[in-house]
């Protein structure tokens, strides 16, 4: 079978973050250590590249600019996938300190640099101003998203989230799934089209991929309640039928979505602006 197109594959390559945002989709508000190298990412990604042709690769944190191997990872992806767009999210706090990476992104092209604007911080505001002054942008709207576009397909985007959705009930030591209908949970999902690669397996989203990992870290609380949501990842040696089924579900509800909140779970819909702090 020829390689199948997929819109996006997100890759978790650092868990640590310099902010603590309650309800973080990748559980990065708690303390983490370590990071992934390009060699480790390539080992996970390569088996899938024999079967899938990603339009975009997203490098997820944590805070990606905290990974000391970020430049090597970016160049590794560009060399292996010269026609694939690289999406790089950041909270912006380290952009000025590591501005050479911003310049590199412009040089290699076909990149989207996205600031998730969590704080009204001078470092972030100065970085935004510098980027806007250093490159000749024109405003564009792509897939309903407002961005700035420069030559060499360099895109710059700023998101200003106001609500974070906590993907589980109670605290980490007593995590419980929401057990909603897939349709109700998917209705407010912010990761509707974000397949996620973690530990070699492909998941519907970061929550599906990282929940078993974070449960294990906290000694698997309420394991009986979580049983339906475990082992949800697709292995690269899956059958053609399994892979095609996964791709057909792209952008649609799935049984795994039941673990997440719906609009009726107001305790899990957090005012992000009041619940973000620097670490």
Map each language-model feature to its residues.
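Conserved alpha-helical substructure of the radical SAM core
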Residues: 1-90, 95-100
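Soluble or luminal CAZymes and related metallo-dependent hydrolases
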Residues: 5, 36-40, 69, 123, ...
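Conserved AdoMet/S-adenosylmethionine-binding subsite of the radical SAM
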Residues: 67-199, 204-208, 213
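Accessory C-terminal segments flanking Radical SAM cores
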Residues: 169-279
């Amino acid at each position: 079978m020829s390689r199948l197109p997929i819109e996006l594959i997100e890759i978790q390559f650092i868990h640590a973050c310099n902010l603590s945002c309650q309800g973080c989709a990748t559980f990065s508000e708690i303390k983490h250590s370590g990071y992934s190298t390009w060699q480790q990412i390539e080992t996970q990604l390569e088996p899938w590249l024999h079967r899938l042709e990603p339009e975009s690769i997203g490098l997820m944190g944590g805070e990606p600019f905290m990974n000391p191997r970020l430049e090597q990872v970016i160049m590794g992806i560009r060399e292996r996938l010269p026609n694939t767009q690289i999406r790089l999210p950041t909270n912006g706090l380290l952009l000025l300190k590591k501005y050479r990476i911003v310049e590199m992104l412009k040089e290699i092209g076909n990149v989207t640099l996205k600031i998730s604007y969590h704080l009204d911080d001078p470092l972030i505001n100065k970085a935004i101003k510098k980027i806007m002054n250093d490159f000749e942008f024109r405003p564009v709207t792509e897939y309903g998203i407002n961005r700035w576009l420069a030559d060499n397909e360099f895109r710059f985007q700023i998101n200003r989230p106001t609500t974070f959705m906590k993907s589980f009930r109670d605290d980490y030591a007593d995590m419980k799934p929401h057990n909603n209908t897939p349709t109700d949970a998917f209705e407010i999902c912010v990761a509707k089209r974000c397949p996620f690669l973690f530990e070699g397996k492909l998941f519907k989203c970061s929550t599906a991929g990282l929940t078993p990992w974070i449960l294990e870290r906290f000694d698997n609380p309420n394991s009986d309640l979580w049983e339906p949501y475990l082992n949800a990842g697709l292995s690269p040696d899956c059958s053609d039928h399994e892979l095609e089924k996964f791709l057909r579900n792209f952008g649609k509800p799935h049984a795994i979505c039941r673990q997440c909140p719906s609009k009726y779970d107001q305790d899990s819909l957090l005012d992000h602006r009041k619940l973000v702090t620097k670490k």
